[in-house]
Each structure stands twice: as structure tokens, then as C-alpha cells.
Design a protein with these regions (language model features):
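Conserved N-terminal glycine-rich FAD pyrophosphate-binding loop of Rossmann-like flavoproteins
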Residues: 38-58
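Glycine-rich FAD pyrophosphate-binding loop
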Residues: 25-45
């Protein structure tokens, strides 16, 4: 199967699904994404993303957007919950960039989701909401899916 010419269906519009759809579309693959929710809504809390992920986001052209919505801590400090005594720290900031080629970032899940959503839309990925997947049939190189809504 040549993913350059074969259409790909991504089931699920969370961070992982959007990231997969974006990565595939940037390679020239025709991508369709289905999501069971009727709308993308703000869900979740803050997440931390390491340099490997921020490097990928940069490679996907999302660095400017990431810089607008994320924070980039200079260090992480672990403290004893009762006494507040510092147990250890991990220098980040410029050190992370020097060692790993990209920064460590903290971002709200909804902001990362929105960044990826806007990127897949700009790539022309077909988004179909309100599509609950109920069956997947794999026969050889072909996969057929069925949703409750008849897709």
C-alpha cells in the first residue's frame, strides 16, 4: 500500500488523531478524519510537552502558534508536599534547546488541540463530526468502516 496515493481515514479527533492526520497530509496523503463528537469543545487541562514533540511541531510549521499559546519554563522543581523543601530540579530553557534542539513547553490541552485543528483544516483534511464508528472490516489491503450515521 502506497500512503502517498491511497486515502487514509483517521478515526478520532483528539490530539493524537489530529496529529496523525496532519503528519499524513503533510506527506501529500489524502486524509479524512471522523470524530464522534458533534463539535470540538474545550476539554482537559495543562499538559507538558518535551523537546521531541516541540521539534515535531516546529517541523510541521506550528512553532509561531505554539509560541503564542504555550509557556517555556526555565526549570522544573520537585518539592516535598508537606515541607516545601526542594527535592530536585531539572534545568530546561536554553539548556533543553542546546541539548535537544528544541524547548520544553507547557500548554493547555485545548490550545494544543486548536493549533492542530487549524493546521489540519489549512491542509485540507476532510473533517466529519458526529460520526460514531461501529464497524471496521479489513480485507487484504482495503479497510471498510461503518458509522452509526451511515458513512
Amino acid at each position: 500500500m502506497d500512503i502517498q496515493t491511497t486515502g487514509i481515514l483517521v478515526a478520532g479527533g483528539g490530539i493524537g488523531g489530529l496529529a496523525a492526520a496532519l503528519a499524513l497530509s503533510l506527506r501529500g496523503t489524502d486524509v479524512q478524519l471522523i470524530e464522534q463528537a458533534t463539535a470540538f469543545t474545550e476539554v482537559g487541562a495543562g499538559i507538558q510537552i518535551g523537546p521531541n514533540v516541540t521539534r515535531i511541531l516546529r517541523d510541521w510549521g506550528l512553532e509561531a502558534g505554539l509560541r503564542r499559546v504555550a509557556s517555556f519554563p526555565h526549570e522544573l522543581v520537585a518539592r516535598d508536599a508537606r515541607s516545601g523543601r526542594e527535592l530536585g530540579n531539572l534545568p530546561l530553557g536554553a539548556r533543553a534547546v542546546r541539548l535537544y534542539g528544541a524547548p520544553y513547553a507547557c500548554i493547555h490541552r485545548a490550545d494544543l488541540h486548536q493549533l492542530l485543528l487549524e493546521a489540519v483544516q489549512a491542509q485540507g483534511v476532510s473533517l466529519r463530526l458526529n460520526q460514531r464508528l461501529v464497524e471496521v472490516l479489513a480485507l487484504g489491503d482495503e479497510v471498510t468502516v461503518r458509522t452509526e450515521q451511515g458513512l
